[in-house]
Amino acid sequence: MIKHIFFSLLFFLTLNASLASPAILGMRERAEVIDHWLQTRVSTVLPELMKRSQIDMWVLISREYNEDPVIRTFLPSTWQSARRRTILLIYNPGNDQPLETLAVARYDVGDIFKKAWDKELHGEQWKRLADLIEERDPKRIGINYSETFALADGITKTEYDLFHQTLPNYLRERVVSAE
């Protein structure tokens, strides 16, 4: 009798819990939610973070299979990793204007980061990045390096050196940690 009551109670509690649980979204619906939140973060949270950190421009550089931990949070839901070399450039023009979000890559990176490099038109990828930075003339350029916070230390030594060599001297002095 006690077993019968116990299993009946267990059955009803399980049934009640399953009825109260939200439905699990399908893959497409999940992707839409993820991409929506990415757009929301980029348009509302990121401008305030950049303003508070006094960073006009944030450059995220990552290579396929060796991603910066932060870049993954900016990739669209359908991407699992960076492709070849993915460079995202986020520029805050100030005066409460929306952020400019560019991909120095051969393709758009989702709906947010628009393609800003055509190899046939612009030549080398690093040169194009330097041109885009010079055109915007930011006061402070954040990149992901840090001595104290591992997740903010995503740029590799090679990528850092190539980035540094690409910039003219006056812009090199403006590079800061984006931690």
Regions found by a protein language model. Name each.
Residues 1-4:
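Positively charged n-region of N-terminal signal peptides that target proteins for export
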Residues 7-16:
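Bacterial N-terminal signal peptides
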Residues 19-179:
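A composition/biophysics-driven feature that prefers long, compositionally simple stretches
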